[in-house]
From Swiss-Prot:
This is Tachykinin-related peptide 4. Its main location: secreted. GO terms for biological process: neuropeptide signaling pathway. Keywords: Amidation, Neuropeptide, Secreted.
Length: 9
């Protein structure tokens, strides 16, 4: 999954 997924948290 893209880093954006973790960045959203």
């Amino acid at each position: 999954a893209p880093s954006g997924f973790m960045g959203m948290r």
